[in-house]
């Protein structure tokens, strides 16, 4: 596990408050499905995922991306208790959905890229480091039931 300093937690909380969470989530999930097409197998019920344009315009991808981003918001509000915050989601993804936990790390990396694109120069190297630590912590919490 990585350790986030109080300063890094503050950076994550502050910068997350500057983005449109719904848009960030939709873009991040869409990009995950485009860049890592094997992740599409978990979203068979989402309809047309045949091309990048179809994925990025898919209303079910956008809706689920929003849901994912709001879950990230919950984690950011509870950075000191991520395992507890994500316990039920970890169990769902492990026991019922059988999602490879590596996908959580991939989504976190995509999220960091989307944040960088949306925040521009404000997304400094220090901010990137703070968010990278946060997404690694979230991925570990989501993978907790797998161990």
From Swiss-Prot:
Modification Phosphoserine, positions: 45
Tissue spec: Red blood cells.
GO cellular component, one term: hemoglobin complex
Keyword Methyltransferase: no
S-nitrosocysteine modifications at: 94
Positions of heme b binding: 64, 93
N6-acetyllysine modifications at: 60, 83, 145
PANTHER family: HEMOGLOBIN FAMILY MEMBER (PTHR11442), HEMOGLOBIN SUBUNIT BETA (PTHR11442:SF42)
Protein name according to UniProt: Hemoglobin subunit beta
Species annotation: Scalopus aquaticus
Lineage: Eukaryota, Metazoa, Chordata, Craniata, Vertebrata
Name of the gene encoding the protein in the UniProt record: HBB
């Amino acid at each position: 596990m990585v350790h986030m300093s109080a300063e890094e937690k503050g950076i994550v909380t502050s910068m997350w408050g500057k983005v449109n969470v719904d848009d960030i989530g939709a873009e991040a999930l869409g990009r995950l499905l485009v860049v890592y097409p094997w992740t599409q197998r978990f979203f068979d019920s989402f309809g047309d995922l045949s091309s990048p344009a179809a994925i990025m315009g898919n209303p079910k991808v956008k809706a689920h991306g929003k849901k994912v981003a709001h879950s990230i918001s919950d984690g950011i509000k509870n950075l000191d208790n991520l395992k507890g915050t994500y316990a039920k989601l970890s169990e769902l993804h492990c026991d019922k959905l059988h999602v490879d936990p590596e996908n959580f790390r991939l989504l976190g990396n995509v999220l960091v890229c989307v944040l960088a694109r949306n925040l521009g120069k404000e997304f400094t190297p220090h901010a990137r480091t703070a968010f990278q630590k946060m997404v690694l912590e979230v991925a570990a919490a989501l993978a907790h039931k797998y161990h």
